[in-house]
């Protein structure tokens, strides 16, 4: 997608943040998300391969090791995030009108070269993190949650249905958050290489990762209760097989409880529009 004339979206957003024009900022972000989604729809049939959680997790481990970080974040990921022709480092300044350009690889990718392909949601995470940078650099008082929501909604409006599904954004299995975590580590790696000081908001976001993970870990209590209730329901049926009408009451209650606990567990997953810094 070639870059045409006119102001880029990064400049448009910066002007909107400076003037405090929330509606204009949301319009720019929604358009950027839609342009990125259109790109992903165009390349969906060109080449996709199955998700690669082993290499993705190994990359996160490598970045953590490079930074000697005291953080560890791994995820099982979902089937709705296949590898595709990723744009890599995506910035709002890469979008002009209805086009998006392929930018240069970032320095961090040269210092820690990827040995894997990436899903579309990683491109989105790169764009969302660029929004966080611009929002922070301009000291904007506009609600970052609403701005992120506009960008994500724009992407969802044009991206392949499976790639932007609820499961793809499910934070308990990685979602958007874990790729934002990767973007923050890449920012820090570049800052260390350039000796340019602590990069914000990356450093602040990384400080909140542990609390974000703790919240998700605590949510697993409901997941465990769901599994236990299902186990007791199955055990009751097996022990009383073939069960009578009266004997079915208890297993049914266990199964209903299992479904209730599971739905509650899923509902506690942090929504993608809420930043890691707002989820603690």
What do these predicted ranges mean?
Residues 35-75, 150-160, 188:
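Active-site catalytic-loop/activation-segment of kinase and kinase-like phosphoryl-transfer enzymes
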Residues 1-21, 26-30, 54-61, 136:
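Conserved catalytic cores of large enzyme domains
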Residues 162, 167-170, 174-278:
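ATP/Mg2+ or Mg2+-diphosphate-binding catalytic cores
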Residues 6, 22-32, 60, 79, ...:
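Active-site-proximal structural scaffolding
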Residues 13-50, 70, 182-184:
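Conserved kinase catalytic-core helix
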Residues 1, 26, 47, 142-149, ...:
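Extended charged low-complexity segments that act as oligomerization/scaffolding linkers
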Residues 48-133, 201-214:
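Catalytic activation segment of kinase domains across protein kinase-like and atypical kinase folds
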Residues 109-162, 180-198:
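Active-site activation/catalytic loop segments of kinase-like enzymes and analogous catalytic loops
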């Amino acid at each position: 997608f070639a870059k045409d004339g006119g102001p880029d979206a990064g400049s448009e957003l910066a002007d909107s943040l400076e003037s405090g024009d929330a509606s204009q900022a949301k319009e720019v972000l929604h358009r950027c998300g839609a342009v990125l989604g259109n790109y992903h729809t165009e390349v969906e049939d060109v080449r996709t391969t199955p998700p690669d959680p082993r290499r993705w997790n190994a990359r996160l481990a490598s970045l953590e090791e490079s930074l000697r970080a005291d953080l560890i974040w791994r995820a099982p990921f979902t089937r709705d995030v296949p590898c595709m022709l990723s744009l890599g480092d995506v910035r709002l300044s890469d979008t002009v009108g209805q086009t998006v350009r392929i930018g240069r690889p970032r320095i961090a990718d040269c210092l820690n070269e990827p040995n894997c392909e990436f899903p579309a949601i990683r491109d989105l995470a790169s764009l969302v993190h660029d929004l966080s940078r611009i929002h922070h650099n301009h000291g904007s008082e506009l609600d970052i949650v609403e701005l992120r929501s506009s960008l994500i909604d724009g992407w969802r409006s044009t991206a392949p249905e499976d790639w932007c599904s609820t499961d793809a954004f499910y934070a308990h299995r990685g979602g958007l958050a874990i790729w934002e975590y990767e973007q923050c580590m890449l920012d820090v790696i570049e800052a260390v290489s350039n000796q340019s000081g602590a990069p914000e908001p990356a450093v602040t976001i990384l400080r909140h990762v542990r609390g974000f993970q703790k919240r998700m870990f605590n949510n697993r209590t409901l997941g465990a209760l769901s599994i236990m209730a299902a186990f007791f329901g199955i055990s009751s049926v097996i022990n009383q097989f073939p069960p009578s009408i009266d004997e079915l009451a208890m297993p049914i209650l266990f199964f209903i409880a299992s479904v209730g606990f599971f739905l509650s567990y899923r509902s506690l997953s942090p929504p993608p529009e809420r930043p890691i810094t707002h989820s603690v």
